[in-house]
Amino acid sequence: MTNTYTAYSVLRDVTLRDGLQLTGKLLSTERKVEIARQLLALGVPELEIGSMARGDLVPPMANTLEVITALTPDELDRCWVWVATPRHIEKAAAAGAKKFQYCLSASGKHNQANIGRTTEASLAAFPDAVRNTERVGGTIELCIATAFTCPFDGEVPVERVISIANDPRTDGAADLVLCDTLGQAVPRQVTRLFDAAQRRTPQRRMVFHGHDTWGLGVANTLAAIDAGAAMVDGSLGGLGGCPFAPGASGNTSTEDLLFATQPSWFTPNVLESMVGLTDKMLAELGEPNRSKSAQGARSEAHVFPWVIRGGTQ
């Protein structure tokens, strides 16, 4: 198997934010911290641990500040928090966070549904978000949701995404995150957008956030890596989706991405531990496991080293 995963392309597990937010169920602070620490101990390079969205609107995120407070500074160096306003950064930073994913949508209608303001208003606030980040010595990403399609307006033009990434008000963003929020993109579209962004926008670390709605989450992620993505997002068991994007389903499975790319730290023993962690969490949430790799790991093809020894489920 050719390993396309390089030292410059790492996985970020987004289970504790994008994975949980659509479930409607709030895991305890202690349980979230336990999951975060288990993932970090397994070798997952980076995590997304929560959102500063209002708890009454997105109940699974109601204890994000408590999760941040419970983690150590060293752990938080590998953990991102979703934010949509400068005030979100102030509050998360006061709890100890240093990495902020500032999200807005290429689609104005989705931005209004997801964040409650226009895309222009989100862009206008970005310089203040950068200043708040710099005050704590942190890092901020510019995350563009609905970079391919919108649940309300359909296909999003490449030029729309490029114009946002090129807006001088986004100066200070270390990363550019391009999101297939609905999971409707195909690999050639991912390649085209990443190529355009790298050629025509400021030099930033490129990140891909995909969903597996149409079964192309892994293929799209591999296309993004080949086109220069330095970090890619996944969620345990393919859990998740945007509550404000009708038609969106789960994220691309962390297990599937890791099996496809096989970074040096990802071994059959790590996969077995990850499958166990996922199964326990999904049972608590009453959610199915959508990971094909988890299914394969439980198969009876025991001569294959990635199959879990000791039985199937």
Predicted regions and their residues:
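Catalytic cores and adjacent flexible loops of soluble metabolic enzymes
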Residues: 1-313
